[in-house]
Amino acid sequence: MNLDLDEKIAIVTGGASNIGRAICMNLAKEGAKVIVADLDTEQGQITSGAANQQYSGEVIFQQCDVTDTKSVKSLFEMTVGKYGAVDVLVNAVGWDELQYFTATEPNFWDKIIEINFKGVLNCSFEALKIMNTKGSGSIVSISSDASKQGEPREAVYGAMKAGVNSFMKTIAKENGRYGVRCNTVCPGVTIPEDDTEVGDNSMWKNIDSMFTQEQLAKIAKTLPLKKIGRPQDVANAVLFLASNKVAGHITGQVLSVSGGYSMV
């Protein structure tokens, strides 16, 4: 199916590894010009290089700290200066450590808030200014099913992702008149295919410390589809929502990609 993403300009934050990497590869495969935005320079360059080798789309890496407004502004200025527009923004940056709330400290909360929520605000703010002027655009934010269910050891993370869900609905209402669509994708437990998908800064770097294989097997049994999600599952949903051709009348939605864990 032609998604009409050829030559579209797409920024993917957190694009160096895991879900973000799969999203970048999907967009490049469709012929988009992709900016891999991430703190991890080494992994970001690996991702952009792999995409350029495999697909026809132009993929470049730009180091960016989504919690720093100057860094974010520089990312968007570079993109517009080089390509003249931003058609798609995917907010794929995310970070968490599984800890009970009473075992954490305020500096831990602040880090989760800065990366998972403020980062989405910073990037969406810059994107909307460009997209509203252009009269079209698509913003997709990666949230989590923890935002819907209230998961133990994810109190602050889940709360911030719930904030992302609400924020995306609101900007969908505010900016639809300019032709801009804003949607959210909520993965469940999603693990990389192998270590090559995981960067040093990824929350999945030490996956074995988060979930044992036995725990993952138990989680899979609770799901209607009986299997744990992979980055490509999430990336496929993002690709659909990014396309105005196939999702042009979809905005303000929160789509779970979790094997049926959440059906709300």
Tell me what each language-model feature is.
Residues 102, 149-155, 177, 226:
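Active-site loop immediately N-terminal to the catalytic Tyr-X3-Lys motif
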Residues 129, 173-174:
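Alpha-helical segment proximal to the catalytic Tyr-Lys
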Residues 124, 160:
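Active-site helix of classical SDR
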Residues 3-35:
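Canonical Rossmann dinucleotide-binding motif of NAD(H)/NADP(H)-dependent dehydrogenases/reductases
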Residues 144:
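Residue(s) in the substrate-gating loop at a strand-loop-helix junction
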Residues 100-101, 105-113, 204-208, 215, ...:
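Substrate-binding pocket helix/loop in short-chain dehydrogenase/reductase
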Residues 4, 227-257, 262:
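C-terminal substrate-recognition "lid" of short-chain dehydrogenase/reductases
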